[in-house]
Design a protein with these regions (language model features):
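Core segments of cupin and vicinal oxygen chelate
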Residues: 18-19, 25-64
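Short beta->alpha transition motifs characteristic of CBS
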Residues: 24-27, 47-48, 67-68, 116, ...
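Short polar/acidic secondary-structure junctions
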Residues: 70-72, 106-107
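Short, charged/polar, Gly/Pro-enriched secondary-structure boundary elements
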Residues: 62-65, 74, 122-124
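Short acidic/glycine-enriched loop/turn segments that link adjacent beta-strands
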Residues: 51-53, 74-76, 109-112
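Conserved catalytic-core motifs of GNAT/GCN5-like acyltransferases
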Residues: 44-50, 106-108, 132
Length: 132
């Protein structure tokens, strides 16, 4: 349902609706290594850095956060899917930085061009762009 907030009753308050994702926070046990990985992909640091316990990267209106947690790496839990302006250019950038994407960019039957990459802590990130 993509409807705007709807009234709870004719005279009552409106029901709240979820509007967007502000941030995704991923755990790392090695902040310097994780920061290098995300910087190599072009994520600009908004707060923190390699020697901090918390780092935030800004992209669009959202953030990708890293937090030091001794329990990392994690078991596979799913993936974060981020839209980018050019999937193939980002794939080439990853290769040039010595990173190892899971596969070459491909066109999916659901209408996106995409590839996956796994960060040093086992978090799977997908970079995608809708096909037009």
């Amino acid at each position: 349902m993509n409807s705007p907030a709807t009234p709870a009753s004719a005279n009552g308050p409106t029901e709240p609706r979820i509007e967007s994702i502000s941030a995704i926070t991923l755990a790392t046990h090695d902040m310097p290594r994780a920061v290098l990985f995300y910087e190599a992909l072009g994520f600009p640091i908004k707060f923190g850095g390699p020697q901090e316990a918390f780092t935030s990267f800004a992209f669009g209106d959202s953030y990708l956060n890293l937090i030091v947690d001794a329990r990392a790496p994690v078991a596979w839990w799913g993936r974060v899917i981020l839209y980018v302006s050019d999937v193939d250019a980002l794939y080439r950038k990853a290769l040039a930085a010595g990173l190892k994407p899971s596969f070459e960019p491909s066109d999916a039957p659901w209408g996106e061009r995409y590839f996956h990459i796994t960060d040093p802590d086992g978090h799977e990130i997908s970079f995608a762009k809708p096909l037009r």
